[in-house]
Amino acid sequence: MEEGYSLELSFAPEIMAGKWPWLWDVVTGERYRLELPAGAALKLDLGPADSKLIVFDKKKEGKVFSAMPAAPAGEKQRLTRWSVEWQHIDGTNTKSEMEELRDLKEIPAYVSFSGIIIYRKTINLESGKFLDLGKVYGVSELSVNGVSQGAQWYGKRIFNLEKGENRLEITVTATMGNYLKTLTKNPVGQYWTNEKRKDQPIQSMGMAGPVTICSRPEAGQ
């Protein structure tokens, strides 16, 4: 569930006869035409817990699918020095600075954190780039200059950034498992996380990264 994987699919001729393959995005509802010659295999590079919906349709005109790169090529710049806001489910709200992103289970002060984590950073770009969030544990939502780029809990988290100022805000939800282990007077929480056969190991949480940016091909290239 935490690692990506690759697939190579072949389709029976009777499925493709008189039809064209389309990729349907189940999140946005968009449909994209796949350029797949008869007899050719379809190669998919999928992210963690990712899946794709392929439909064969008689319609043949439409926007051609262009996948985000599985691993953007070119020299990568690692983003460090993040401002972080911690909105705990117990109602407390604190802020801190993180020089390097880390899995919360590796940080004693936050190993049992549960709630909303907001990572903020502003960068200025001389040209359009790819942004790769790296390893993220939990549901995340990226906003750029106040505009949401969508929430995501699966797949590779790679996005386009435009030239100029980019105010990044990445919101990650940390679930309750690690926190429940600390509630020793809560019998329900202890039953599901600590007792006997239901003893749950400490789970990875938050944005471990590394978050990187790298060049993307310009239009026409």
Label each PLM-derived region with a short phrase:
Residues 1-116, 124-126, 147-152, 173, ...:
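Carbohydrate-binding surfaces of carbohydrate-active enzymes
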Residues 2, 135-137, 163:
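A generic beta-sheet turn/junction motif
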Residues 44, 159-161, 169-171:
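Ligand-binding pocket scaffold of soluble enzyme catalytic domains
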Residues 51, 164-182:
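Short, well-structured beta-strand segments enriched in hydrophobic/aromatic residues
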Residues 123-145, 152, 168-172:
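Aromatic-lined ligand-binding clefts that engage carbohydrates, nucleic acids, or primary amines
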Residues 155, 161-164:
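Glycine-centered tight-turn motifs at strand-turn-strand junctions
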Residues 178-221:
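Exposed low-complexity, polar/acidic, P/S/T/G-rich flexible segments that act as propeptides
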